[in-house]
């Protein structure tokens, strides 16, 4: 091993070499980024502006992974993580950064990405955040399960960069109404002795525990995700939970036999109570099932819908609002409640079924939902005078969707993105000089405090043909 002084190192470091570095930024996983002799160095638990002695661990392509040996200088934005297992758990990556520090970091990252990938130098509004809800904001948990060869059940999220489970009995980012069940359910699952393996590497059995809560109604839905229905005493255990906790409205078993990155399967079996819970969202009553996609941060989702409705308020009620990638109607239904006629487009049939059910539940007859390939449906339904709302998955817009927008040129477009990189790519094609639109506003939203994720709403207006 070489000495700890930089002068004794060759231009290409070796594992075990030690140097002093200063952190320049964080990567998308929350790891510190630094440079040494033109090499990118990745080291955990280091914030921008902090310096430390690090030890090189291994080379990965044109980067070096390193571990922090000793902190030399810290920044004022560092804080003790609210969670005692934050340094090990892969669920949250920046709990050690203050709430204000997280806001500044995310604002800067969004600006860098839009400028680098989209050549977009537009004003970005202050991040829509709520420091009072930086913890306890998640309305849903999907927690891996594993029983080892000694029969001990492990329940928790994965250790950073591995499939090893870090046990937990509470999680600070989960709604406290979820937290209260974790320890008791874990104890009961331990006693039941059912096999459990989240990634099916050792056979069939339980894979995940799911808990969903209506943050306004406090109703709870508990789900066991399993690769098999052969779990002795399952119904009795479900009935016992149902009678033990009045807030629990349903217990379900979701079957997921596939070894992929999808936690939930398509088949859900009712064990006790009801298949759905009620949640109040933007003055509407919504039914949510085990597999319903619903924003995990209810209050922030309401705030972004409010922003959209405010933006729409100057539009004539005679136009159509086309909501592409509408899901269960989280955006469509509140807009319809203001009087606009809304057409929702969605690929997944189950989501459309729930959207129609929720429209009927709220007596909204000015909204309709169509199931199919969104790019094909949009080409058939979009008109020039319409307002288009886009809420695509992380991969962004299909090229056919962009071609349809550029061909028909609806008057206004709202694009809610969960990935700034694909947002930058898509906006570059829609904005002058490549397209007919100008940006009215870029509004970032922090749906996931304590993580590196940032979402952004782009509001566009047609200015040329």
Swiss-Prot record:
Biological process per Gene Ontology, one example term: rRNA base methylation
Binding-site positions, S-adenosyl-L-methionine: 295, 325, 346, 391
EC number(s) recorded for this UniProt protein: 2.1.1.-
Keyword Electron transport attributed: no
SUPFAM superfamilies cross-referenced by the UniProt entry: Nucleic acid-binding proteins (SSF50249), S-adenosyl-L-methionine-dependent methyltransferases (SSF53335)
Enzyme class (EC, first level): transferase
One GO MF term: rRNA (uridine-C5-)-methyltransferase activity
Binding-site positions, [4Fe-4S] cluster: 83, 89, 92, 171
Active site: 418
Domain of life according to the entry: Bacteria
Domain TRAM: 12-70
The keyword Nuclease appears for this protein: no
Keywords: 4Fe-4S, Iron, Iron-sulfur, Metal-binding, Methyltransferase, S-adenosyl-L-methionine, Transferase
Protein family per UniProt: Belongs to the class I-like SAM-binding methyltransferase superfamily. RNA M5U methyltransferase family.
Protein name according to UniProt: Uncharacterized RNA methyltransferase PMT_0737
